[in-house]
């Protein structure tokens, strides 16, 4: 296995083009499946708030900080625990992972994985 050097300071990559691209793609993919959550829990805006935050950050319309990202992510995951159907739970988890992309870009992979599960569960 090849070990890639890891930057010790996130300032070297935070807010870079590719970092924002990961966040934007995660937000777009998660938006596609949020319907499963919002159909079941239309008044619960926690996952939607997470998606809005990461998307606005990726578009350069908003700044984010660790405390805000942590709260948005944990709130979205808590919303997932409150949901009854698998599709709704996976969609909310996808939102929690999407906003986590601000902290660690590879959280986008979690967003894509949960979004895929939401699609499959939504077809049942």
Give a label for each model feature:
Residues 2-124:
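Structured binding/interaction patches within domain cores
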């Amino acid at each position: 296995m090849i070990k890639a050097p890891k930057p010790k300071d996130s300032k070297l990559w935070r807010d870079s083009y590719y970092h924002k691209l990961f966040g934007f793609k995660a937000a777009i993919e998660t938006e596609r499946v949020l319907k499963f959550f919002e159909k079941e829990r239309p008044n619960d805006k926690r996952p939607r708030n997470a998606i809005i935050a990461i998307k606005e950050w990726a578009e350069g319309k908003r700044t984010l900080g660790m405390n805000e990202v942590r709260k948005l992510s944990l709130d979205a995951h808590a919303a997932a625990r409150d949901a009854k159907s698998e599709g709704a739970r996976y969609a909310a988890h996808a939102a929690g992972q999407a906003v986590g992309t601000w902290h660690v870009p590879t959280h986008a992979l979690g967003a894509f994985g949960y979004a895929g599960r939401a699609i499959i569960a939504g077809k049942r």
